Curated annotation (Swiss-Prot):
Biological process per Gene Ontology, one example term: chromatin organization
Protein name: ASTRA-associated protein 1
Gene3D superfamilies xrefs: YVTN repeat-like/Quinoprotein amine dehydrogenase
Keyword Repeat: yes
WD repeat ranges, renumbered to this chain: 7-49, 51-88, 101-141, 269-314
Top-rank lineage group of the source organism: Eukaryota
Family according to the record: Belongs to the WD repeat ASA1 family.
Alphabetized UniProt keyword annotations: Chromatin regulator, Nucleus, Repeat, WD repeat
Locations listed in the record: Nucleus
Originating species: Kluyveromyces lactis (strain ATCC 8585 / CBS 2359 / DSM 70799 / NBRC 1267 / NRRL Y-1140 / WM37) (Yeast)
Described function: Component of the ASTRA complex involved in chromatin remodeling.
Length: 399
């Protein structure tokens, strides 16, 4: 059954499902005021908190670390509270604080997220917007054990000159890539989504390599990037009704391709694979359990089959309720007098076929197993609520 999480007093701006089936089903949420909450989804209560000085922009899970980027121009690395994952929650007045173990100043003027990858046991690499120019990127490395180890290895890296020399000027005309909108890591490649609609894949191995270029969303801005594990692709959304599908050719050699003083281009092909769906202005996109889930500026979330061809259902919050409707075709935009509530964050939780709950309570064990038998979509709204809805429609999916 759908349920609602209520604790935030302002708009929810970021959600992250803690992806570890050995832990109690857990959600991490952040809001406009900088509050971070760790939720037990069985008890439906928060059991840890942390407060930043600005709006939460994004979360990333990296092993047992929570990477939180906020509008106070700071990236914080917090320790996930693994010792208390089976607790039922604490009274509101006594929520314990998450442990802060590292923080880095970053540029969050344009609401772009960040991406952190692990280099070895204690060393990490950060990809983010340049501290002064959001159209260029910085790359840092640091040792998590040493608060003074932060070192910038690439500064104000611009990709425009290289990309503009590869495109056909008769079909694509642009004088810049624009602001960096999104970062995401998949299979060792860092994908950047730009205001111009380009998605570029980078890899740092004995120099910086461009391994993938796509104009699928050109000339509209990239609004979101997500990993489509069932597809083996990265998916991008934009203001139009096209989703970009991104798969680099990792076996491409660089010796016959383009290079500059900053980067080597391993694959100079401009890719444009995409799929069209019957909604536009897709601000949030997720792919889970052979489902494609898209949330639009209209306040409607639509569930598709994995290829985006068949509409299975839609989710809409109106006047404090969530309406589930098999017809997704509504207004393309949100009128001023609309009673729909704006979607401000989304994440999904996949099914787990085999779950071995680490708890002693038989009741908790049953709820744990039952929860993971469903696919869940969790949506954060501008009114501070978080709605959790099952999105398993196996009986409607055709081969």
């Amino acid at each position: 059954m759908p349920f609602t999480l209520r604790y935030h007093t302002c708009g929810v701006t970021s959600l992250l499902h803690w992806n570890d089936e050995q832990d109690v089903p857990t959600l991490i949420s952040g809001d406009e005021k900088g509050s971070i909450l760790v939720w037990n989804l069985l008890s439906r209560k928060p059991y840890y908190k942390y407060t930043c000085r600005g709006q939460i922009v994004s979360f990333q899970q990296l092993n047992d670390l929570i990477i939180a980027t906020s509008k106070d121009h700071t990236l914080r690395i917090l320790k996930f509270p693994s010792t208390l994952t089976t607790k039922e929650g604490f009274p509101d007045y006594s929520l314990p604080e998450l442990e802060l173990i590292y923080e880095i100043p970053v540029n969050t003027l344009n609401f772009a997220n960040t991406a952190v990858e692990q280099v070895d046991t204690n060393n990490y690499r950060l990809w983010c917007c340049n501290t002064q120019d959001s159209e260029t990127i910085d790359i840092y490395e640091f040792d998590l054990r040493d608060s003074k180890s932060l070192k910038r290895i690439h500064r104000a890296l611009s990709l425009y000159e290289v990309i503009s020399g590869l495109v056909d000027p008769s079909t694509m005309k642009f004088d810049k890539l624009g602001t960096t909108m999104k970062f995401i890591i998949y299979e060792g490649i860092i994908y950047l989504g730009f205001e111009s609609g380009f998605v570029i894949g980078l890899r740092l191995t004995q120099g910086l390599h461009i391994v993938y270029i796509s104009s699928a969303n050109y000339p509209e801005p990239v609004l979101d990037l997500t990993v489509g594990k069932d597809l083996g692709k990265v998916i991008s959304s934009s203001t139009n009704s096209s989703l970009g599908l991104h798969t680099p050719n990792i076996n491409t050699e660089s010796h016959n391709n383009v290079s500059s003083k900053d980067v080597v281009v391993d694959d100079s092909t401009i890719h444009s694979e995409m799929v069209n769906i019957p909604i536009n202005k897709v601000s949030h996109i997720q792919q889970v359990d052979n489902l494609l889930i898209a949330a639009s500026w209209s306040g409607r979330t639509v569930v598709f089959d994995i290829n985006g061809n068949k509409v299975l259902a839609s989710i809409l919050k109106e006047r404090g309720q969530v309406l589930i409707d098999d017809n997704p075709y509504g207004n393309a935009s949100l009128p001023e007098n609309s009673t729909k509530v704006k979607i401000s964050a989304m994440t999904c939780i996949p099914k787990f076929n085999t779950v071995n709950p680490s708890c002693t309570s038989e009741g908790t064990r049953r709820r744990w197993i039952r929860f993971y038998k469903e696919t869940w979509c969790l949506i954060g709204y501008a009114d501070g609520s978080i709605k959790a809805t099952e999105v398993t429609f196996d009986n409607l999916i055709t081969a």
